[in-house]
Swiss-Prot record:
Disulfide bridges in this chain: none
Residues binding NAD(+): 62-87, 174-178, 215
Pfam families registered for this protein in UniProt: GDP_Man_Dehyd
Name of this protein: UDP-glucuronic acid decarboxylase 6
Keywords: Acetylation, Cytoplasm, Decarboxylase, Lyase, NAD
Function: Catalyzes the NAD-dependent decarboxylation of UDP-glucuronic acid to UDP-xylose. Necessary for the biosynthesis of the core tetrasaccharide in glycosaminoglycan biosynthesis.
Catalysed reactions, as listed in the record: UDP-alpha-D-glucuronate + H(+) = UDP-alpha-D-xylose + CO2
Region called Disordered, residue ranges: 1-22
Source organism of this protein record: Arabidopsis thaliana
């Protein structure tokens, strides 16, 4: 960015205004849409929703580190759908109008297994997608995370809260990677006039979650169906809020189509302790299963709950599916994949 200096003061030129042609494309009926990480859990549900609009062409880029072609099998071969095996740490050259940038491992098991790859995906991957957005004049949405708030001292968390974070912890490759990704998004917006949207997504659950990915809802349901004890990490009073995947997808699409840059919290403000969640899974799925306390992992936040006032106000969005309604839908999917019939 150019700057001028006179009389000891420095002024910085404002970013260039996006061209009217760039803005006009976001109101056209035919859209070419790129979804990075589209073979993953949330990404594949987003693809399903986007493909319901017969005027959308959807391109998915995924390296299958945590995603699976099985999540997209009903669209493979469809004339409006294209699947590319691609790692976002390498540049991608496609012509698109919108970019949903979801690519990144979201489970502690996966991002602790390869922390360097995780932070490269967040930083270099986001740089590459911003470069693509700049080249083709696309609007880009980043799925950031509630993890940017760290172990919050403010509860519930609003978008204005800067967080209480550990930049060198075992989870930092993910948490700090997303914080850098948000920084890059706003820097490209200010310097190059890129149309950006940032969603801070909170814990999400539903069908197609990886069965053994280490996240608490999938852990509990898989353990219950296998007849294993539900392992609650001590002390069990730590809280999370759980958003059903269809609600999450609706929130992301409203943010993309709206005129708000964000960041905006997308999540369900219903708050549960880990013991309460385990008891709910036990009640709904396998009442005779044991609940067992185990040692906690490092850097586990004590509480997490979104303030969604902004999403309600500017997007007209709030979640509809309650936890007791969503868990049986996820149970049905897990039963099929684990081969455990309902008795």
């Amino acid at each position: 960015m150019a700057s001028n200096s006179s009389n000891g003061t420095t002024t910085t030129k404002p970013p260039p205004m996006p061209s009217p042609l760039r803005n006009s494309k976001f109101f056209q009926s035919n859209m070419r849409i790129l979804v990075t990480g589209g073979a993953g859990f949330i990404g594949s549900h987003l693809v399903d929703k986007l493909m319901q609009n017969e005027k959308n062409e959807v391109i998915v880029a995924d390296n299958y580190f945590t995603g699976s072609k099985d999540n997209l099998k009903k669209w493979i071969g469809h004339p409006r759908f294209e699947l590319i095996r691609h790692d976002v740490t390498e540049p991608l050259f496609v012509e698109v109008d919108q970019i949903y940038h979801l690519a990144c491992p979201a489970s502690p098991i996966f991002y602790k297994y390869n922390p360097v790859k995780t932070i490269k995906t967040n930083v270099i991957g986001t740089l590459n997608m911003l470069g693509l957005a700049k080249r083709v004049g696309a609007r880009i949405l980043l799925t950031s995370t509630s993890e940017v708030y760290g172990d919050p001292l403010v509860h519930p968390q609003t978008e204005s809260y800067w967080g209480n974070v550990n930049p060198i912890g075992v989870r930092s490759c993910y948490d700090e990677g997303k914080r850098v990704a948000e920084t890059l998004m706003f820097d490209y917006h200010r310097q190059h006039g890129i149309e950006i949207r940032i969603a801070r997504i909170f814990n999400t659950y539903g069908p197609r979650m990886n069965i053994d990915d280490g996240r608490v809802v999938s852990n509990f349901i898989a353990q219950a169906l296998r007849g294993e004890a539900l392992t609650v990490q001590k002390p069990g009073t730590q809280t999370r809020s759980f958003c059903y995947v269809s609600d999450m997808v609706e929130g992301l699409m409203r943010l993309m189509e709206g005129d708000q840059t964000g960041p905006i919290n997308i999540g369900n403000p219903g708050e549960f302790t880990m013991v309460e969640l385990a008891e709910t899974v036990k009640e709904l799925i396998k009442p005779d299963v044991e609940i067992k306390m185990v040692e906690n992992t490092p850097d586990d936040p004590r509480q997490r709950k979104p303030d969604i006032s902004k999403a309600k106000e500017v997007l007209g969005w709030e979640p509809k599916v309650k936890l007791r309604e969503g868990l049986p839908l996820m149970e049905e999917d897990f039963r099929l994949r684990l081969g455990v019939p309902k008795k």
